[in-house]
């Protein structure tokens, strides 16, 4: 199977037998080209597992930049940085974001001046990244080139690309009296998603172009993976950039559910799904993507009823343990995704 064929909503769902032993599997993975559409923490931890499961594969990560925000004149790219720090060994493991061992002297000094916003935690080490990125952007480098420069230090072991060099901003339409629209970070970090969302707008997406290398990475991929990222404001934002969803539809795609037992592992995927009228379940997320995008779908063992769910007709569903409690667990999940892809491609 080489992806969806015919019209964009057609899908071939034939599934071959189980993959062979570990040795042949590893041999087949050598030189395999994998493209991953990634959000932040969940994607970064999955990518560590993927790197472990397929150390010789060529992995390109297309990162969500809809969360990017300007703070104190600095261009902050939360999801790109989370992937870069995690794979480069500099992440705050407890938080899942930000730099390890960071301090907040600069933020405290800004607060003493009464300068805001004070609701977004920028650590001192993290600020160095944003200063360097902002300086490069000011010198005329596109975000993709600036990301490449930052990755020279961190050596993440993957090619990390922003979804676009153009400005795309995820905005949240609040379900309040005024129907206000706020930046996603303000809704999530400042408001803690306490005000229900009525919907989401990917401002600028219609006029954006995929960053250099993005469409090529998808077109040349043997496999596209959707990690357990937010399907609406992470993967959904990436797919909103013209040309990306169409390219993905032509490939074999395996996704990992971010919902276990009816609740997100972390984050607010349930609130986002509710805002667009989708069910916060493994079945609901799989159906949201649909057979036009997904060929295979991994759900947790407690959601094994999804394997035969009629809403997921045309998608090969497998139930496995999905909690990424440590690197071995993340590796097992990534390996299961690769095994399912090999079944689909047999």
Q: What spans do the regions from the language model cover?
A:
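Short internal beta-strands
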Residues: 60-64, 253-259, 296-301
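N-terminal glycine-/serine-/threonine-rich phosphate-binding loop
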Residues: 25-98, 190-221, 329, 334, ...
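Internal active-site segments that recognize and position negatively charged phosphoryl groups
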Residues: 156-158, 171-246
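C-terminal functional extensions of proteins
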Residues: 266-346
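Short, conserved loop/helix-junction motifs that constitute active-site signature segments
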Residues: 52-57, 245-251, 290-293
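Redox- and metal-dependent alpha/beta enzyme cores, enriched for Fe-S-associated oxidoreductases
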Residues: 236-276
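Electropositive, gly/pro-rich neighborhoods at or near active sites that engage anionic ligands
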Residues: 63-202
């Amino acid at each position: 199977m080489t992806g969806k064929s015919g019209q964009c909503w057609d899908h071939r769902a034939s599934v071959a037998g189980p993959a062979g032993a570990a040795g042949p599997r590893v041999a087949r993975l050598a030189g395999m080209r994998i493209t991953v559409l990634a959000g932040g923490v969940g994607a970064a931890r999955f990518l560590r597992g993927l790197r472990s499961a397929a150390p010789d594969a060529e992995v390109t990560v297309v990162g969500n930049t809809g969360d990017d925000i300007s703070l104190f004149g600095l261009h902050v790219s939360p999801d790109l940085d989370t992937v870069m720090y995690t794979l480069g060994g500099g992440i705050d493991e407890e938080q899942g974001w930000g730099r390890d061992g960071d301090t907040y002297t600069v933020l405290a000094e800004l607060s003493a001046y009464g300068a805001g916003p004070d609701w977004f935690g920028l650590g001192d080490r993290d600020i160095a990244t944003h200063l360097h990125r902002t300086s490069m952007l000011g010198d005329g480098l596109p975000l993709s080139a600036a990301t490449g420069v930052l990755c020279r230090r961190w050596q993440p072991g993957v090619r990390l690309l922003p979804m676009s060099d153009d400005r795309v901003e995820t905005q949240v339409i609040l379900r309040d009296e005024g129907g206000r629209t706020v930046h996603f970070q303000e809704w999530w970090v400042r408001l803690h998603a306490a005000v229900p969302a009525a919907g989401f707008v990917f401002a600028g997406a219609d006029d954006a172009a995929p960053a250099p290398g993005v469409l090529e990475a998808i077109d040349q991929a043997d496999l596209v993976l959707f990690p357990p990222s937010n399907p609406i404001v992470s993967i959904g934002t990436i797919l909103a950039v013209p040309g990306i969803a169409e390219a993905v539809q032509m490939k074999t795609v395996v996704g990992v559910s971010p919902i276990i037992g009816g609740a997100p592992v972390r984050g607010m995927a349930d609130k986002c799904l509710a805002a667009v009228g989708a069910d916060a379940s493994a079945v609901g997320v799989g159906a949201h993507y649909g057979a036009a995008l997904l060929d295979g779908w991994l759900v947790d063992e407690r959601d094994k009823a999804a394997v035969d769910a009629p809403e997921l007709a045309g998608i090969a569903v497998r139930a496995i343990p999905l909690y990424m409690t440590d690197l071995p667990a993340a590796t097992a999940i990534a390996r299961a995704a690769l095994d399912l892809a090999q079944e689909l491609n047999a």
